[in-house]
From Swiss-Prot:
Potent blocker of nociceptor cation channels TRPA1 and high voltage-activated calcium channels. It acts mainly on P/Q-type (Cav2.1/CACNA1A) calcium channels and has a minor effect on L- (Cav1/CACNA1) and N-type (Cav2.2/CACNA1B) calcium channels. Blocks glutamate release in synaptic transmission mediated by calcium channels. The toxin also inhibits the KCl-induced increase of intrasynaptosomal free calcium. It also shows antiproliferative effects on different glioma cell lines (M059J, U-138MG and U-251MG). In vivo, it shows analgesic effects in rodent models of pain. Residues 22-34 form a propeptide. This is Omega-ctenitoxin-Pn4a. Negative results: does not target TRPV1 and TRPV4 channels. The presence of a 'disulfide through disulfide knot' structurally defines this protein as a knottin. Transmembrane segments: none annotated. It comes from Phoneutria nigriventer. Keywords: Calcium channel impairing toxin, Disulfide bond, Ion channel impairing toxin, Knottin, Neurotoxin, Secreted, Signal, Toxin, Voltage-gated calcium channel impairing toxin. The lineage of its organism: Eukaryota, Metazoa, Ecdysozoa, Arthropoda, Chelicerata. GO terms for molecular function: calcium channel regulator activity; toxin activity.
Length: 90
């Protein structure tokens, strides 16, 4: 009888730890905006929002007046190093 109680206690403890591990939020899931990026052609506000090293947030003339919107566009090969420095995550 004592063995049955001990066995059931062990099963209950294992179950509790498994449930707690499943309910614990993943640290990566807490900040989805860091992983999210904007594809080429979509509206952006900063270079760091655009996907890839070779994309920049291009604002055409008139965008400061609200006539045009800034969007992710292809950048030259030298832009990649500047973007890496600018968009470093602390």
């Amino acid at each position: 009888m004592k063995c049955a109680v001990l066995f059931l206690s062990v099963i209950a403890l294992v179950h509790i730890f498994v449930v707690e591990a499943e309910e614990e939020p993943d640290s990566d899931a807490l900040v989805p905006q860091e992983r999210a990026c904007i594809p080429r052609g979509e509206i952006c506000t900063d270079d760091c929002e655009c996907c890839g090293c070779d994309n920049q947030c291009y604002c055409p003339p008139g965008s400061s007046l609200g006539i045009f919107k800034c969007s992710c566009a292809h950048a030259n090969k030298y832009f990649c190093n500047r973007k890496k420095e600018k968009c470093k995550k602390a």
